[in-house]
């Protein structure tokens, strides 16, 4: 059994070059969407069926005088499927198309998925998209085919700043811990690891070093990192109570009486 | 305030129609069963009509659900695990969509059998036979079918809640809302379809039932909005055109609620039935579409 693998994405050294996006599309033969040009450098906007890597630009730096020591910078982060230990997509998938591979990654089997799209509403990171071309849900495979050929994922291979690092989880954890310590030593107090421990979906095989709170990057914090199944009991209970009251009300209203034109059918 | 970053699954018209048909099919079956078990001898005709209409609606459910899939011909993957080397049946009790698939299949069987028997008895009734009372086992069969029908009408809402989508996952009341509204629309539909079969007493009882169901729906609706408000998600369902839809949904509850309050039979049966049914459809449209933008 191979060792669990994953990505460590260090957003502190991401320069927003999008080489990861290009390499991912090239290798996985993704056509991509028509670029969306707006007031910023982000023209892919989101992760979806055609974008399995997406460089987020958090560029809403307020206008103002920047002096030494009070500067503000854009934040950039190459986002990707988190390959969660407790994966919400895998939890709800009715066809069992979403499986955990021998590399401990989360993989959608294209031939098994029938395109019900329940996984899309379950994924808390907005990672999965539906492809009208294939009729299936699609997302990062962590280059499952390349892993089988002992190659590293395409995005990690091309990343010029080593913002995206691939390797065994234990190695990546050690590198991330060292990097975080270095940043804290430099006074970057907001720097934090996201998904390194088990507080977010039991741990993420694709985890991040962030330079601000997770919410700033559009990532759920610990309180909001919840599984869909949390609502099972309450929802079923409410539905059951409503159904029981409905049946009771129906019986009360519809029961025949001698006044209503005859004896009850049950006693006829 | 709860924060969500899930993407929209693109569940639109087919799913809306499926959820709507599921509520009607389940509701009609339940009302037919109640009429059979607790109604008068004359109500048996209306019970048969309910069973006869429930089955085509279930067939529509299957069609809508299948057409919505990205790969409709692979619909059976919901039930059979086609993962290489795995095999066996797909059964995930913690995934409502998985349980719902089986519930739909089972309810289809129950509604088909009820449809066949009701159609046969209907033929006998037209031939003038006197004894048309169903055998005892039919009643037991119908009770089991009703439980499945109620599940079908409600699980569609639970599917939405068991997600990470805003609005849907912010409320646990959607399943309750769907089952209450399904019963309400079914009572309205039954009153309208069965107007030639029902006497004044039956019509009055159906309207009273619809009034109770509408009251239940109103309570579920209040719970839905309260839970959304608590999660800070009201704005995600009351934006754009959707607040107008929600107002129409509330207005559609007025005819059955008025009938509940009045002792006399409410006027405009066909129109009020249409208003109730349209309101139930609008409610599903508002729930499903407003959360996906």
Regions found by a protein language model. Give the residues of each.
Chain B
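Short hydrophobic alpha-helical membrane-anchoring segments
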Residues: 32, 36, 62-65, 114, ...
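Long, contiguous internal "core" modules enriched in hydrophobic/ aromatic residues
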Residues: 12, 19-21, 38-41, 47, ...
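Active-site acidic/histidine clusters and adjacent loop/turn architecture
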Residues: 106
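Membrane helical hairpin/interfacial module
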Residues: 24-80, 86-103
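C-terminal TM-helix exit segments that contain a strictly Trp-centered aromatic cap at the helix terminus
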Residues: 60-72, 152-159, 219-228, 280-290
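N-terminal signal-anchor module of multipass membrane proteins
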Residues: 1-41, 277, 285, 289-293
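Extramembrane terminal tails and long inter-domain/linker segments of multi-pass membrane proteins
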Residues: 1-9, 76-93, 125-132, 277-293
């Amino acid at each position: 059994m191979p060792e669990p693998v994953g990505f460590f994405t260090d957003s502190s050294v991401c320069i927003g070059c999008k080489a990861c996006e290009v390499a991912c599309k090239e290798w996985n033969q993704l056509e991509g969407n028509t670029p969306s040009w707006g007031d910023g450098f982000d023209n892919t906007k989101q992760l979806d069926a055609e974008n399995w890597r997406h460089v987020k630009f958090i560029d809403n730096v307020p206008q103002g005088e920047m002096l030494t020591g009070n500067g503000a910078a854009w934040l950039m982060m190459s986002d990707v499927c988190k390959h969660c230990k407790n994966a919400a997509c895998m939890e709800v998938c009715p066809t069992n198309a979403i499986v955990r591979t021998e590399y401990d990654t989360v993989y959608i089997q294209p031939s098994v998925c029938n395109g019900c799209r329940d996984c899309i509403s379950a994924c808390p990171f907005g990672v999965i998209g539906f492809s009208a071309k294939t009729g299936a849900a699609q997302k990062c495979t962590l280059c499952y085919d390349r892993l089988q050929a002992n190659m590293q994922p395409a995005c990690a291979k091309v990343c010029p700043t080593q913002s995206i690092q691939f390797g065994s989880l234990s190695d990546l954890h050690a590198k991330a811990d060292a990097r975080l310590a270095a940043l804290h030593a430099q006074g970057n107090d907001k720097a934090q690891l996201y998904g390194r421990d088990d507080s977010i979906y039991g741990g993420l095989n694709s985890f991040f070093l962030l330079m601000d709170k997770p919410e700033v990057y559009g990532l759920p914090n610990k309180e909001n990192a919840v599984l869909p199944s949390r609502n099972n009991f309450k929802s079923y209970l409410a539905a059951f109570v409503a159904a029981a009251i409905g049946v009771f009300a129906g019986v009360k209203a519809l029961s025949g009486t001698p006044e209503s034109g005859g004896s009850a059918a049950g006693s006829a | 305030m709860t924060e969500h970053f899930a993407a929209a699954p693109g569940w639109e018209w087919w799913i809306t129609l499926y959820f709507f048909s599921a509520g009607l099919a389940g509701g009609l079956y339940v009302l037919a069963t109640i009429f059979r078990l607790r109604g008068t001898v004359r109500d048996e005709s209306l019970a048969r009509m309910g069973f006869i209409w429930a089955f085509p609606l279930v067939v529509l459910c299957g069609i809508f659900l299948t057409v919505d899939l990205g790969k409709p011909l692979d619909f059976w993957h919901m039930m059979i695990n086609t993962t290489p080397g795995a095999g066996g049946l797909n059964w995930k009790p913690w995934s409502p969509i998985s349980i719902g698939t089986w519930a739909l299949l089972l309810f289809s069987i129950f509604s088909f059998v009820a449809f066949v028997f009701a159609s046969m008895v209907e033929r006998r009734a037209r031939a003038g036979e006197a004894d048309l009372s169903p055998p005892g086992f039919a009643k037991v069969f119908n009770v089991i079918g009703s439980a499945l029908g109620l599940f079908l009408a409600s699980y569609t809402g639970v599917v939405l809640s068991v997600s990470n989508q805003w609005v849907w996952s912010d409320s646990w009341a959607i399943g309750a809302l769907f089952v209450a509204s399904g019963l309400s629309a079914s009572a309205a539909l039954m009153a309208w379809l069965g107007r030639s079969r029902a006497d004044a007493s039956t019509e009055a009882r159906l309207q009273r039932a619809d009034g109770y169901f509408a009251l239940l729906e109103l309570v579920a609706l209040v719970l839905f909005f309260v839970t959304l408000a608590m999660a800070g998600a009201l704005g995600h369902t009351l934006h754009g055109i959707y607040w107008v839809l929600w107002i129409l949904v509330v207005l559609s509850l007025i005819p059955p609620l008025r009938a509940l309050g009045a002792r006399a039979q409410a006027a405009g049966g066909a129109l009020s039935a249409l208003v109730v049914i349209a309101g139930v459809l609008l409610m599903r449209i508002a729930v499903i579409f407003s959360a996906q933008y």
